[in-house]
Amino acid sequence: MLHHVAAVVRSSRTALVIADMPFLSYVDVGAAATNASAFLRDAGAGAVKMEGGAEMAPIVRALIESGVPVIGHIGFTPQSALQLDRTRAQGKEPATAGQLLADALALQAAGVAAIVIELVPTELAALITQRLTIPTIGIGAGAACSGQVQVLPDLLGILSGPSPRHAGE
């Protein structure tokens, strides 16, 4: 993974390259610090992105306090989806919607620079965006987020199964 991030960094003159921390690479503060610092030091990334909510806040805070810029990721979390049985949109039920809002607030309090919100109902993504003071980046979460991302394999339809609805036709 470091090799791929380094290649992107070498090919970019001005973009902020954010390394997506692999699943299980940040299970505790020690592992997170070792792996995140490698992305920054060895690959040249400008920040790391980590999936998870309030349960990740202590690890996120420790990284940020050590100088590692972190982007959060809540809602559908693709790296852990199969392992954690979260293969669908998140936040449709009141309890999970409330938890996602709490997750976003906890990550903001921990110091993340922005939060990716993926496959969350439009109204919930709008509420989260309104409640935060940091940018939100939506993936299939409606137009109310601060910015949007489209995933190239989704747009091209090159994965098995149907393309996500938010990818368009």
Report residues per predicted region.
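Alpha/beta enzyme core
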Residues: 1-167
